[in-house]
Amino acid sequence: MIKLLFMGTPQFSATVLKGLLDNPAYEILGVVTQPDRAVGRKKDIKVTPVKQLALEHGISIYQPEKLSGSQELIEITGLGADGIITAAFGQFLPTLLLDSVSFAINVHASLLPKYRGGAPIHYAIMNGDKEAGVTIMEMIKEMDAGDVVAKASTPILETDNVGTLFEKLAIIGRDLLLDSLPAYLSGELKPIPQDHSQATFSPNISPEQEKLDWTMSNQEVFNHIRGMNPWPVAHTFLEGQRLKIYEAQLAEGEGLPGQVIVKTKKSLVIATGQGALSLIVVQPAGKPKMSIIDFLNGIGRKLEVGDIIGR
């Protein structure tokens, strides 16, 4: 049985971890995940999906704010793990930790060397890519730059958003890891170096990127909305108040960027730099997420054709 240390945080990571837990060839000695966070207005404490899964299986849990230089680092290097598996962990692994194991493998949600970094799924959708994928790669000190063990791809559908693609890639990543790891460990599968000249990056989404630019084409704004749903969520402004936009549909029509060009009891169409978008699901400031029909029956009632949002 191969003894592993697992490192990751979101549901993507938990899906990969569950695959390892269900496989009798592997024993998970411990998991390293982000600290619990206070979320929402009530500041409720929320544990990570990886921690929740570890709790259910009685696995030791380590939650350093920063792994390098921590007491937890000393503890996990002494666990006697054969190897490390990471998936959406979000921190560099200290040399001390890498040197303590025979192998360290990362499950990364892009087709490397494209989209190294923390938000590959967001950028794949926002950039209008036709496919996304997962790469199994060796861990080195440089971010997502290790040799490639295996890759798998899947089409990005017009109906996909970050949430749906996240779920698809988690399953692909889980299966790809379990399929390739035995051959990698036996030496049958030889890792291939990345072409570093082709590397692109996907840094974490900044607050500035969340704001919609109505001068873009309707396809670009549509992709941007999908690439921010369900987090961190794209927004525009209505009378100085933030209006989050979760879903929209491509529409025909012309007008000034951000201008209301159609308003009925059931629809609100906004012009973009080229074409238009029909808003489907929105969230006004201080309100819950709602359908465009509910919005037009409430705060949106005062909007008129010709008004411009986003200012």
Curated annotation (Swiss-Prot):
It is an enzyme of class 2 (transferase). InterPro entries: Fmt, Formyl_trans_C, Formyl_trans_C_sf, Formyl_transf_N, Formyl_transf_N_sf, Formyl_transferase-like_C_sf, GART_AS, Met-tRNA-FMT_C. Its EC number is 2.1.2.9. Keywords: Protein biosynthesis, Transferase. Coiled coil: none annotated. One of its GO terms (cellular component) is cytosol. CDD domains: FMT_core_Met-tRNA-FMT_N, Met_tRNA_FMT_C. It catalyses: L-methionyl-tRNA(fMet) + (6R)-10-formyltetrahydrofolate = N-formyl-L-methionyl-tRNA(fMet) + (6S)-5,6,7,8-tetrahydrofolate + H(+). One of its GO terms (molecular function) is methionyl-tRNA formyltransferase activity. (6S)-5,6,7,8-tetrahydrofolate binds at residues 110-113. Attaches a formyl group to the free amino group of methionyl-tRNA(fMet). The formyl group appears to play a dual role in the initiator identity of N-formylmethionyl-tRNA by promoting its recognition by IF2 and preventing the misappropriation of this tRNA by the elongation apparatus. Belongs to the Fmt family. This is Methionyl-tRNA formyltransferase. The lineage of its organism: Bacteria, Bacillati, Bacillota, Bacilli, Lactobacillales.
